[in-house]
C-alpha cells in the first residue's frame, strides 16, 4: 500500500468528523431539505394543510442538521472535538446515552426519504438548482461509501500480505 493511502486508512481519515460531516451529514441534510421543499410544493399545489406543516418541519429540521454538520466539520478542521453531534437525532441520542443508535435512525430516515422522492416521482418536481443539489449530495455520499469500502479492502489485503510475509507489488 502506498504511504499516502496507508496514512488515509491507518490514520482513520474516513472516520474523522470532517469526512463524516461533509460526506454523510451535509448530504443527508440536503436530502431532507429538498424533501421538505417538495412536500411544501405538493401541499400548495394540492391544498393539503397537514403537508404544509410537515414540509416546514422538514425544512427546519434539515437546516439545523446541515448547520450542525458544517459546525462539526469546522471544529474538526480546527483540530477540536465538536461540542455537538452531526445531526439533531444524534444529539438527542447523546442525551439518552445512545448517539450511534439515533444517528443510525437518522440514516434510515434519510435513505427512506431518498427512496420516497425517487419512487413517488417527486424528484421530477425539483428545479434546476435543486436537482443539482440532489445530484451533488448523491455523488458525494455514494463516492465516499465507495472510497471507504476500497480502503477497507486495501487494508485487508495489506494485513494478509503482512501475515503471509508477501512483498507488495
Task: Please provide the spans of the model-predicted regions.
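Juxtamembrane/interfacial segments around transmembrane helices
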Residues: 59-75, 103-116, 151-166
